[in-house]
A protein has these predicted regions:
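A hydrophobic alpha-helical transmembrane-helix feature that marks the membrane cores
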Residues: 1-244
Length: 244
């Protein structure tokens, strides 16, 4: 499955001339805490939506056939939704943005259901627990560290492109060693991105970008959601033997 993070949710919404469209607002500590808590809340709800859809897909052969037969359309829709939410956030209401996020989470649940179904249950549980622990540790680090993690953003996006290119090359070579390397790099990459995103959320960078705590919380939730899902998928590759 292609990495939905390649849609670059780090891009700031701009006008046709390239200037920011959101007004600058002052972000105090209370606003920062409210924003961070809302971002995590919507992220967890999005994960529950994806998990619920993935479970239903795993129990329904008809849904599996539907997802398999429309996989390309699902991937295109996921990319379009990620672009739409990230780049169009200032042109839509917070309610619409949140609704689109949940639609995105549900569509990704369809593809996740297919992926998870191809692994042993023990591997899935181990990958989920490991991803949860690493995500939690990175989130705590991003919250408490005094170190500026700004440089991680640009480096990580280039790393994602590198992973995608390596994955495409590996389709032809089917190298288990390269698969392991890609998976390990992916785990490190999205662990670092989690810390980076949490720090930016706490600092109120997304509130400044969108001019709204509610809208910024949706963008924050999308980023954290993608961090966790990709971390889980790379961990699943490792626990599943790296052959898929």
């Amino acid at each position: 499955m292609s990495d939905p993070r390649v849609t670059n949710p780090y891009a700031n919404p701009t006008t046709a001339t390239g200037t920011p469209v959101a007004p600058a607002i002052v972000v105090d500590r209370r606003t920062s805490i409210a924003f961070l808590s809302h971002a995590f809340l919507w992220m967890f709800v999005g994960l529950l939506v994806s998990a619920g859809v993935a479970f239903v897909v795993g129990e329904s052969r008809q849904l599996q056939q539907f997802a398999e037969g429309n996989l390309l359309m699902l991937l295109i829709a996921q990319v379009a939704l990620a672009f739409g939410i990230s780049l169009g956030i200032n042109k839509m209401s917070a309610t619409l943005a949140l609704g689109l996020f949940f639609v995105y989470a549900a569509s990704l649940g369809l593809t996740l259901g297919l992926i998870i179904g191809s692994y042993p249950q023990a591997s899935v549980v181990s990958a989920f627990l490991s991803a949860s622990a690493m995500f939690g540790a990175a989130a705590v680090y991003g919250t408490v560290t005094k170190r500026d993690l700004s440089s991680i953003g640009a480096i990580a996006f280039m790393g994602i492109i590198g992973i995608l290119v390596a994955s495409l090359i590996n389709i032809f070579f089917a190298s288990s060693e390269l698969t392991w390397i890609i998976s390990i790099v992916g785990v490190v990459l999205f662990t670092a991105l989690t810390a980076y995103d949490v720090q930016k959320i706490q600092q109120g960078a997304l509130v400044q970008m969108t001019g709204s705590v509610e809208k910024a919380a949706v963008i924050g939730a999308l980023r954290l959601y993608l961090d966790f899902v990709n971390l889980f998928l790379f961990m699943l590759r490792l626990f599943g033997g790296g052959s898929r």
